[in-house]
Amino acid sequence: MFLIAIAIILATILVFKGVRIFNYIDHMAGIMEMIPGPTPYPFVGNLFQFGLKPAEYPKKVLQYCRKYDFQGFRSLVFLQYHMMLSDPAEIQNILSSSSLLYKEHLYSFLRPWLGDGLLTSSGARWLKHQKLYAPAFERSAIEGYLRVVHRTGGQFVQKLDVLSDTQEVFDAQELVAKCTLDIVCENATGQDSSSLNGETSDLHGAIKDLCDVVQERTFSIVKRFDALFRLTSYYMKQRRALSLLRSELNRIISQRRHQLAAENTCQQGQPINKPFLDVLLTAKLDGKVLKEREIIEEVSTFIFTGHDPIAAAISFTLYTLSRHSEIQQKAAEEQRRIFGENFAGEADLARLDQMHYLELIIRETLRLYPSVPLIARTNRNPIDINGTKVAKCTTVIMCLIAMGYNEKYFDDPCTFRPERFENPTGNVGIEAFKSVPFSAGPRRCIAEKFAMYQMKALLSQLLRRFEILPAVDGLPPGINDHSREDCVPQSEYDPVLNIRVTLKSENGIQIRLRKR
């Protein structure tokens, strides 16, 4: 009798819970189905309509954004509703909010690696950590980081010298990624990195494997569920990579602690390049030093966010420069004005601040090819987006990849015109949200200034040394509006966009170089 009673109680609880879940889903559906969007299939929702391959997804997102006139529309993946936004007025509503700071569903695949680091944390924790790390991106700290950028950039140029001798076609995307990985690893940890020279450390290998796992889970029906993911080989790959990463970072942290102690006693008053790790080792949160786990999470976040997005931006900028020789010529002339006779000099902050036209080129490139094509927030309470009611616990996805193709804000969007961003009044009101490659509002990228300086520094070195050429002479501009279903690439060398956490080209960034 006792067992029967227990069974009845458990069954009652399960039924009660089931009814509550059903009513909750029904309530959400009642709100969200009032919003325009593609018709979902049973269970999987709109999963198949958006494509299951990295190269399909960006095209589908762009096409749906145009289909709904770049206004917000809803989609459904399994039982999770998404609100897809691409209009700056709607995006301003979200990014300006001081309460919509939570990143949940779409960032869950990063959490085994980045934990509660600055990218993935939310609420009070994020706010405290953001203030704590602000000194790491002050002008004096950036000057130290740029020494690493200049030295590694010099090694990068030496590698490219060999390719320029024969003017052979090569994939810039791959080499740029190695360069930025070397830079970010050294600036994060203080340890020399040699990815450009073909050396692969445990840290490099672990980072690559973890990026592979995140990319795989993003587009896999099976692996996106934790329980099923644990049954796959990718779970073991993730475990091995995390073990290697933590072991290597623990070693580096221990070594750096000893170095800091030695510097404090033996090198007082001497200027040194301080890596990001130093900020973490000396920081105090609520009067306490950071735990080892917190330090590892923040170093991992610094490496992840400072590697892939920067590499993507530089790679696509090289592509746009290769297809627009007149614009490239103007950028090269700007470099000559800044450096004068010392054309091989170091691009310090004073010189980088003068590279106005180069910055316009980078911003115009990011309009078309944003490194982070989608950013997301989760609303924990019901919200109103410019008159549209959105149910709580919806994942609000801002489609940065589509914003630059909206004729309402950018006339002739497939024309590469850096001067679009020259308007000095263009950083107020809605104008500030027309293009947000570094996000905006309270959760704007804390390292935006350093990211821009790094991109300008590396591109400056390349522009002063090489003429950047298309894969084949005479190629058209190669900017394709994939939001239109009838879009056909202008050549086989045009990038085939895919989303592998950051925006990449499936067929690489194919260019040639010629010494100036």
Swiss-Prot record:
This protein's UniProt keywords: Endoplasmic reticulum, Heme, Iron, Membrane, Metal-binding, Microsome, Monooxygenase, Oxidoreductase
Cofactor dependency: heme
Function: May be involved in the metabolism of insect hormones and in the breakdown of synthetic insecticides.
Membrane topology of this protein: Peripheral membrane protein
CDD domains: CYP4
Gene Ontology MF, one: heme binding
PROSITE patterns assigned: CYTOCHROME_P450
Lineage: Eukaryota, Metazoa, Ecdysozoa, Arthropoda, Hexapoda
Regions crossing the membrane: none
Its EC number(s): 1.14.-.-
Gene3D superfamilies tied to this protein: Cytochrome P450
Compartment(s): Endoplasmic reticulum membrane; Microsome membrane
Protein name: Probable cytochrome P450 4ad1
Organism of this sequence: Drosophila melanogaster (Fruit fly)
PANTHER family the UniProt entry points to: CYTOCHROME P450 4C3-RELATED, CYTOCHROME P450 FAMILY 4
Family assignment from sequence similarity: Belongs to the cytochrome P450 family.
Residues that bind heme: C445
